[in-house]
Swiss-Prot record:
UniProt keyword annotations, A-Z: Bacterial microcompartment, Cobalamin, Cobalt, Lyase
Pfam families: EutC
GO biological process, one term: ethanolamine catabolic process
EC number: 4.3.1.7
Keyword flag Lyase: yes
Function: Catalyzes the deamination of various vicinal amino-alcohols to oxo compounds. Allows this organism to utilize ethanolamine as the sole source of nitrogen and carbon in the presence of external vitamin B12.
Protein name: Ethanolamine ammonia-lyase small subunit
UniProt family annotation: Belongs to the EutC family.
Binding site for adenosylcob(III)alamin: 207, 228
Record gene name: eutC
PANTHER family in the cross-refs: ETHANOLAMINE AMMONIA-LYASE LIGHT CHAIN, ETHANOLAMINE AMMONIA-LYASE SMALL SUBUNIT
Length: 293
């Protein structure tokens, strides 16, 4: 028996053991299994939209109700579970997505259309770009003489209240909160009989920029709304720094601060009403910061 006959015999025996297979059926099955299905209307869920306060990834928790009750009180990453000794894929992806959002908030700019829509007069500090803004904080507190003159011609001097918006370290915070916060401030001031001018927008802005403006313009109260350094909890946190007659070299303790203005903290509308009340108090007591106590 030669090799060819041996091969034929083996094929015959195998065929008898497993049954003859229809090659056409096999081909069709393989084709269906490997066929690519494309759904043009489908999309991947945005992982950052998941409320981690309501998400429990621990497998078979002893007391899930108590765990969720604890998570509801903090945005901390609790109950994220493990795959062996490692984080789960969903946990890692959410961490990276939140980190990316924080980076984007720092390195992006407030949209020019947004500035126009909110009727803000835009200027910028001495910083030329974002890199210089991050590495030279001192330049983010100063304005050129030309810029100061432009501001004076637009807003005048010796104003009672100046509302200032600075991009700070989070452009996302400004775009997310300003439309609700500013109207609440203006409405509150109007109730107290206090006039507020147009809004000044400052690009590459540090908190100390209000000191330079206070000294040059002679405003009684300056309220600065500025994007705060983003973190993994949120990239949309805004703060309000308010000072009575700010000047260059003013101690930080003389500023009154309302922080964590975002949808997961103090809401923009609530913060706006509180800011208006604080401005009224500062004008009455002619003080701010710890001097207001």
């Amino acid at each position: 028996m030669n090799e060819k006959d041996l091969k034929a015999l083996v094929e015959q025996l195998v065929g008898q053991m497993v049954g003859e297979l229809d090659t056409n059926v096999v081909s069709e099955t393989v084709k269906k299994a490997t066929e690519v299905v494309v759904d043009n209307n489908a999309c991947i869920d945005d992982i950052t939209e998941v409320d981690i306060r309501k998400q429990l990834l621990v497998k078979n928790p002893k007391d899930a109700e108590a765990y969720l009750d604890m998570k509801a009180k903090t945005p901390a990453r609790l109950g994220i579970g493990r795959a062996g000794t490692r984080y789960k894929t969903e946990t890692v992806l959410r961490f990276r997505a939140d980190h990316a959002a924080a980076q984007d908030a720092v390195f992006s700019y407030v949209d020019e259309e947004f500035i126009k829509e909110n009727n803000m007069f835009a200027v910028e500090t001495l910083c030329k770009d974002k890199d210089e803004y991050l590495t030279r904080p001192d330049l983010g507190r100063k304005f050129s003489p030309e810029t100061i003159n432009n501001i004076k011609s637009k807003f005048g001097t010796n104003q009672k209240v100046l509302i200032l918006v600075g991009d700070g370290l989070s452009s996302a915070a400004i775009e997310a909160n300003l439309k609700d916060c500013v109207p609440a401030i203006k409405q509150g001031l109007k109730m107290y009989g206090i006039d507020s001018s147009e809004i000044l927008f400052v690009k590459h802005c540090r908190v100390g920029a209000m000191d330079h403006l206070g000294e040059e313009l002679g405003c009684e109260v300056i309220c600065m709304l500025v994007g705060e350094r983003p973190g993994l909890v949120t990239a949309e946190s805004m703060s309000a720094y308010i000072a009575y007659k700010p000047y260059i070299g003013m101690a930080e303790a003389k500023r009154t601060v309302i922080s964590n203005i975002h949808k997961g903290g103090t809401t923009a509308v609530e913060a706006g009403a509180h800011i208006a009340e604080l401005i009224k108090t500062m004008l009455d007591k002619k003080a701010s910061g710890i001097d207001l106590k």
